[in-house]
């Protein structure tokens, strides 16, 4: 889909036009650049959750500020984004921010398989342990690769697994900011499974698996949950937290 969209844009835009990819994951810009090298591809990041509650009805359920890679052509547009209520956080290097966001997005698969709204899922200790294991595995790989993910939430990246493994009452107390989520908010992957659409598992867990391969390491927990999402069918039933922990061996 990324390559096809990039090709369509290349046919409609003048050569050299800057285009920001706001998709989840890390490699989308590389895919777009290969498909449409005549355009200037830049990184972007959407920090908040957007759920499709009904056809044409998109619901923003969490807070955050759009982040983009700096480009001289963007400067004149910044006041317009501010006026529209969509201020941009501009970064010379967005890659650490994207990895910081990807760490949070590792929960998307857990949320999708749970069948629950995000807040309800995060209040379940078993589901939190699953997400903590996915993040811990990824943090290890990032350290091996010399990549330092940026802080894009209330907690530092390295603290996320410890925070998620806290007992329920303590988690509610310590993670109050994390739990400021609209009751209707779900992950985009949950929307995809509900509508039997192709998910973005390859752009999230897939990035972790590719990083592991580059580092000659394994990422078994991310591989297992990726397998679960890929094998999902319209007849599949949501997994309880205990069942998911057992499958992931965490």
Residue ranges and their predicted role:
Residues 26, 45-50, 72, 94-98, ...:
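Glycine-rich beta-alpha junction loops
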Residues 12, 35-40, 57-155:
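Internal alpha-helical scaffold of NAD(P)-dependent oxidoreductase catalytic cores
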Residues 1-57:
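Rossmann-like NAD(P)(H) cofactor-binding subdomain of soluble oxidoreductases
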Residues 15-19, 63-66, 214:
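Short active-site oxyanion
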Residues 82, 132, 136-250:
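NAD(P)-dependent Rossmann-like dehydrogenase/reductase catalytic/cofactor-binding core
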């Amino acid at each position: 889909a990324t390559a096809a969209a990039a090709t369509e844009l290349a046919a409609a835009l003048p050569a050299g036009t800057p285009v920001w990819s706001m998709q989840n994951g890390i490699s989308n810009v590389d895919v777009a650049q290969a498909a449409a090298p005549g355009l200037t591809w830049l990184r972007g990041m959407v920090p908040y959750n957007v759920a499709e509650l009904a056809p044409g009805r998109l619901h923003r359920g969490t807070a955050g500020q759009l982040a983009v890679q700096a480009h001289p052509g963007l400067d004149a547009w910044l006041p317009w984004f501010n006026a529209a209520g969509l201020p941009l956080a501009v970064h010379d290097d967005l890659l650490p921010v994207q990895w910081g966001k990807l760490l949070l997005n590792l929960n998307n698969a857990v949320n999708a398989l749970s069948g629950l709204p995000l807040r309800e899922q995060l209040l379940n200790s078993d589901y939190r342990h699953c997400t903590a294991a996915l993040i811990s595995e990824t943090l290890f790989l990032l350290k091996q690769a010399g990549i330092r993910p940026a802080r894009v939430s209330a907690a530092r990246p390295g603290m996320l697994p410890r925070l998620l493994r806290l007992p329920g009452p303590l988690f509610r107390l310590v993670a109050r900011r994390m739990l400021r989520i609209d009751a209707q908010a779900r992950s985009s992957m949950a929307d995809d499974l509900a509508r039997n659409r192709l998910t973005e598992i390859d752009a999230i867990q897939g990035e972790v698996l590719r990083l592991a391969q580059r580092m000659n390491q394994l990422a078994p927990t991310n591989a297992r949950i990726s397998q679960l999402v890929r094998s999902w069918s319209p007849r599949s039933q949501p997994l309880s937290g205990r069942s998911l922990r057992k499958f992931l061996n965490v």
